[in-house]
Amino acid sequence: MSTTNELVNRIDETYEISNIVKEIEIDKIALSDLELLATGGYSPLTGFLGKRDYDSVVETLRLANGSVWSIPITLPVTEEVAEKLQAGEEVKLVNAGNVYGVIQIEDIFVPDKEKEALLVYKTTDEAHPGVKKLYERPNVYVGGAIILTKRFGNNPFPSYHLDPIETREEFKKRGWKTVVGFQTRNPVHRAHEYIQKSALEIVDGLFLNPLVGETKSDDIPADVRMESYEVLLQNYYPKDRVFLGVFPAAMRYAGPREAIFHALVRKNFGCTHFIVGRDHAGVGDYYGTYEAQEIFTNFTVEELGITPLFFEHSFYCTKCEAMASTKTCPHGKEDRVILSGTKVREMLRNGEIPPSTFSRKEVVEVLIKGLKKEVVTE
């Protein structure tokens, strides 16, 4: 495994698979992980974690060689499938009848899922979407290096779906020496816009990198969100300072640990800085408001390879008549309009139109149209 910021490349569409007999049916999460492992999005990982690295990541947020890595990237299989596999063999990775890759099996092991839940998600509560998914997936893990033998054909956002090598190239083309990454699974409301633009004041470019893999069922669908990002960037951001590209991973909802993971992945995509806001990658009340920022104190910027930028909760202040945070505004709670993606979602679902202090009107229009479409298809 490479520890420098070299990109791993495990794509080989000419790899000979015709004589490989065994196969593993992989789920959507493993499929998106397979792609990100192969394209270098998860560098320095070269495959699904073996037991030694898995234990190390779960317990110490580092790989066995000491490199920082906070989320276990695993390939779960059923006991029935595991019985037919052995270390040292190559097995095809299949989803919906298509062979997408190969795993070179290094080891097969049974994880302690309760321990994984407790240490990675800080809870064993099955109401937590990450924990629920962890328990739903099969109980045996297969570790080993992978090879991606087929690129995905039915990509919903082809013009925004770029590999790390391509985003790095784009940033270079634009002459950006410093790039700040922003992770989101929500439409961008005014608080996000304020944070992004504050960060943009100190770097050359903003990489808006929405997650479009598997999310909770009540999250706003990716196609609606993408349209909302397009109208926002078109109307309110300087075109030569912002770049939109999707992050095809599944959402883990692992709060602090996922914040580290999101930063490491954005480094691979070419970012030098990464925005960490309040309750980054959180869900419900499982994590403290700024826990995802505090976790970064356990690591140096050198070992992360990317500089985190921390932002406090921002709001619209009716007295300042502007977006602000507690760092910049002296007024009391009664003057603050607190904005959140959850609140915007709630208002839209109840047929209310969020005020312009919450969200840009162009964004609201896209969301209302998208939700109407959703209701019709349900």
Curated annotation (Swiss-Prot):
SUPFAM superfamilies: Nucleotidylyl transferase, PUA domain-like. Coiled coil: none annotated. The keyword Protein transport does not apply. Keywords: ATP-binding, Nucleotide-binding, Nucleotidyltransferase, Transferase. The keyword Isomerase does not apply. GO terms for molecular function: ATP binding; sulfate adenylyltransferase (ATP) activity. Its EC number is 2.7.7.4. One of its GO terms (biological process) is sulfate assimilation. InterPro entries: ATP-Sase_PUA-like_dom (IPR025980), PUA-like_sf (IPR015947), Rossmann-like_a/b/a_fold (IPR014729), SO4_adenylyltransferase_pro (IPR020792), Sulfurylase_cat_dom (IPR024951), Sulphate_adenylyltransferase (IPR002650). Pfam families: ATP-sulfurylase, PUA_2. Pathway: Sulfur metabolism; hydrogen sulfide biosynthesis; sulfite from sulfate: step 1/3. It catalyses: sulfate + ATP + H(+) = adenosine 5'-phosphosulfate + diphosphate. Belongs to the sulfate adenylyltransferase family. This is Sulfate adenylyltransferase. It comes from Bacillus mycoides (strain KBAB4).
